[in-house]
A protein has these predicted regions:
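Solenoidal tandem-repeat scaffolds enriched in leucines and small polar residues
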Residues: 160-220, 224-230, 235
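Glycine-rich repeat segments that build the extracellular carbohydrate-interaction surface of secreted
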Residues: 30-35, 53-79, 91-98
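Right-handed parallel beta-helix/beta-spiral solenoid domain characteristic of secreted/periplasmic
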Residues: 90-139, 150, 156, 180-182, ...
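Short, T/G/N/S-enriched strand-turn elements that build extracellular solenoid repeat scaffolds
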Residues: 55-64, 78-88, 103-105, 111-117, ...
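Right-handed parallel beta-helix/beta-solenoid
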Residues: 2-57, 287-292, 303-304
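All-beta strand scaffolds that present successive hydrophobic residues in beta-strands
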Residues: 72, 92-95, 118-124, 146-150, ...
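Predominantly polar beta-repeat domains that present long G/T/S/D/N-rich surfaces used to bind, process
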Residues: 3, 10-11, 228-304
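Residues in short coils/turns that link rungs of repeat/solenoid architectures in beta-rich domains
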Residues: 100, 130, 155, 160, ...
Length: 304
């Protein structure tokens, strides 16, 4: 049973008490802090005064499905040249801090910055910085039941695709910012392999004004997607299409897109083209291609 030391010399038996973070776990807790003079991946990293130096170094200390938590400390930063392998199931990575003090990860090289191959992993409150060349994605998700929450997925000239989904089911992105900062980005989230079922993307912002538009789609799927939900997302600076799930063709509804707002970066012939829904139901989505004009329903057609 875990023991948490309190300031007056008391001990708390049971789940570790992690300050005011609201995180309870019976697993092990590890700290990562590039700003610490004592940082080393050779440390046990269970004490914030002797943390690991890298995210990947902390992952190597975790036990699968043990409820382990990794805290990336405020101001932590890494330049990643070999993909961070989230290959231990059930690990939760939490970035501490707010604003630009949240942990910042910069990929360099022909890599996916983080490669999630294990199931039930979580990443929260981390900023992924774009690059000038080579990087293929900020996060690749191949493990089922992945959660990404309050992430900043930045795309400069690369990566062309912010997040790739490689056959994972039940992934969930919430309250994330996908941000274009230089010309080049093609897609925010690309579901690139097979039918990823029962996934959710909600309360996210896809903002590509800073990249003079997003070339292909905020969310794109190349295969049929069953049970997907896109909810309450804002798409700003779309060149062509905000959501492209045209490979889903079920007449009975494969999923739903609801409550989304879309701003095209240039005039389009028909705002209906801002969503290519395939077999997805559309409910109360709005789009516009001109400033100072009210957005119209997408699609314009209403049910008979």
């Amino acid at each position: 049973m875990a023991v948490t030391a309190l300031s007056a010399g008391y001990n708390s038996f049971g789940p570790p008490v992690l300050g005011a973070s609201g995180v309870l776990t019976t697993g092990d807790v590890y700290f990562v802090d590039s700003g610490s003079s004592q940082a080393s991946d050779g440390n046990a990293a269970t004490d914030q005064k002797a943390p690991a130096a890298t995210w990947d170094g902390a992952i190597a200390k975790c036990t699968a499905n043990n409820g382990d938590v990794i805290f990336l400390m405020p101001g932590h930063s890494e330049t990643v040249t070999t993909a961070i392998a989230m290959d231990v199931a059930g690990v939760r990575v939490i970035g501490l801090g707010w604003g630009r003090s949240i942990p910042a990860i910069t990929p360099s090289g022909t890599i996916d910055c983080v490669n999630v191959t294990a199931a039930n992993c979580v990443i929260e409150n981390v900023r992924f910085i774009g690059a000038a060349a080579s990087v293929t994605a900020q996060i690749n998700v191949a493990g089922d039941d992945f959660t990404g929450h309050k992430l900043v997925i930045q795309q400069d000239a690369v990566p062309l695709i912010g997040v790739t989904i490689a056959g994972a089911d039940r992934f969930h992105f919430s309250d994330c910012l996908f941000l274009g900062t230089a010309a080049g980005p093609d897609v925010g989230i690309d579901i690139e392999a097979g039918d990823s079922s029962d996934w959710v993307v909600e309360d996210c912002v896809f903002n590509y004004v800073g990249s003079t538009g997003l070339d292909l789609a905020g969310i794109r799927a190349s295969k049929q997607q069953t049970g997907g939900l896109v909810k309450n997302c804002d798409f700003i600076g779309m060149n062509v299409t905000a959501i492209d799930i045209n490979s889903s063709v079920s007449a009975l509804s494969d999923g739903m897109i609801v409550g989304c707002n879309i701003a095209a970066i240039a005039s389009v012939a028909n705002i209906d083209t801002l969503i290519d829904a395939g077999g997805y139901i559309l409910v109360e989505n709005h789009g516009s291609d001109l400033p100072a004009e009210a957005g119209g329903l997408v699609p314009v057609a209403t049910p008979a």
